[in-house]
Amino acid sequence: MVLSGKIFCIMLLRLRTFWLWAIFVSAVIIAVGWNQRERAQPLAPPLPAPVQTTPARALKWSVVKAYPHDTIAFTQGLLWHGGHLIEGTGREGHSELRRVALSTGGVLQKRQLPDDVFGEGVALAGNRLVQISWQNGRAFVWDEKTFAKIGEWKYDGEGWGLTFDGENLIMSDGSDELSFRDPKTFKIQRTLPVTFNNQPLKNINELEWIEGEIWANVWQTDCIVRIDPQTGVVKSYLDCSGLLDNKARSGREDVLNGIAYDTQTGRIFITGKWWPKLFEIAVEN
């Protein structure tokens, strides 16, 4: 059969249109399928911690100076910024975000959390302070200067400690795992199991990023561990027993909880819940 030029062109155009639609529909199906796969695919499980052949080393420390600390403050988070301490406190009805004068322990600025919220760790990411809560599943985002609320995130599970490594917010939840979270969305990017002498280390609490390491206190102890952020291995630790004299303790739940680091001077500050003092300490390398 001989086709005229006009009919042949029409058939080619129709055939071309058919194939374009076929390609388009195929692309949509592939994209939808891939998107569903992406959404359904969970985070990759954390890699197992490497075998630690050398036991964690106990580091020597000494007190450089002691400062007054508000005994009403149930300290849950601590950091140093702009010449002052930023402190997050806990307990329902008493949870606050505070800016504190180092020399006097006086509260220069504060923001009350909702009465039903038990405040926990706090971290500075850019010009925003992020403060988490214990069992409320709420992370509050505050303006660093005014303490005005500028956002809030929801998350699953408990919140204990929080710090920022310059790229991710790092959160503890009382288990032996840390979660690395996007500072813009608070979504988990990866998790890190923590081990101490090849054993899972639970009750990881308040966190501080210090010179490429995660420093953390272990709840219900006076121990501070230094965690490798890549492997989760604790290579060294500080036994801070005796830092606060027993005579200065009230007998309440006043365990060590609060680590702050001055990046400009290298000073390290430590305090605890309801402690009457905050200490600057020096640590051996």
Residue ranges and their predicted role:
Residues 63-68, 106-112, 148-153, 190-198, ...:
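A short beta-strand motif characteristic of beta-propeller blades
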Residues 105-141, 148-159:
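Blade-loop segments of beta-propeller domains
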Residues 101-105, 143-147, 183-186, 228-232, ...:
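Short loop/turn segments that connect beta-strands within beta-propeller blades
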Residues 64-96, 111-123, 272:
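Beta-strand-rich domains and repeat architectures in extracellular enzymes and scaffolds
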Residues 71-82, 115-125, 155-167, 172, ...:
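Beta-rich, blade/repeat-based domains predominating
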Residues 139-197:
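Hydrophobic, well-structured mid-protein blocks that either form specific transmembrane helices
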Residues 86-92, 129-136, 171-175, 216-220, ...:
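Conserved beta-strand positions in repeat-built beta-propeller and related beta-rich domains
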Residues 51-72, 102-106:
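A short helix->beta-strand "capping" segment at the edge of beta-propeller domains
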